[in-house]
A protein has these predicted regions:
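Active-site mouth of glycoside hydrolases
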Residues: 1-150, 182
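Active-site clefts of carbohydrate-active enzymes
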Residues: 100-108, 152, 157-185
């Protein structure tokens, strides 16, 4: 488990990256997320390893971590068929976020070890781009993030909520006028 799957999802991602490149848009790629693909609807089975592990267990289980090391290395070495360039060498991909909204219920040392293993896999794969880590969750281990070699941090923000249950209409710019860090005290 943990091998990069050549499928419609990857082809669509490659196509998106090519179109963004055509428009001069540079991006940070989030390598993985560890929850279902259907939120808020039912998940559809895709055969990915993240279905074998709970969102929090995926960051602690040795088999899951080994699968992620294989996957993240394969992802950065993947050659986009539309551009002919690997993700790690694409100048329009400016960096990688290890994962979206990680869950670290364990200790600071376990968290640090997980991040360092992902960083090691990226380095071994030849990545020279900055690597970011999402720090919006798991405040009990946040110091562990900064005891690693990540070059930056990322945050998620749902200024109008995550799911409304209906189509929202109107001007949403006032909702993104200011960001207040919820744990800044």
């Amino acid at each position: 488990i943990g091998n990069l799957k050549e499928n419609d999802h990857l082809r669509l991602l490659d196509y998106l990256f090519m179109r963004l490149r055509e428009r001069g848009i540079r991006i940070v790629v989030t390598a993985q997320t560890n929850f279902g693909n259907g939120y808020p609807e039912r998940n559809q089975p895709t055969g990915g390893y993240s279905y074998d592990y709970d969102k929090c267990d995926v960051h602690q289980n040795p088999k899951a971590i080994a699968a992620q090391e294989r996957y993240i290395a394969a992802l950065v070495n993947h050659v986009n068929p539309y551009t002919g360039v690997s993700y790690k060498d694409d100048p329009y991909i400016i960096g990688f976020e290890i994962n979206n909204e990680p869950c670290h219920p364990g200790t600071k040392e376990q968290t640090k070890s997980y991040i360092n293993r992902m960083l090691g896999a990226l380095k071994k794969a030849g990545n020279k781009k900055p690597v970011f880590y999402n720090v919006s969750h798991n405040q009990h281990v946040v110091e562990a993030y900064y005891d690693t070699a990540v070059q930056g941090t990322t945050y998620q923000w749902y200024p109008t909520g995550l799911v409304a249950g209906h189509t929202r209409k109107g001007n949403f710019l006032p909702h993104v006028d200011a960001y207040h860090i919820p744990f800044s005290n």
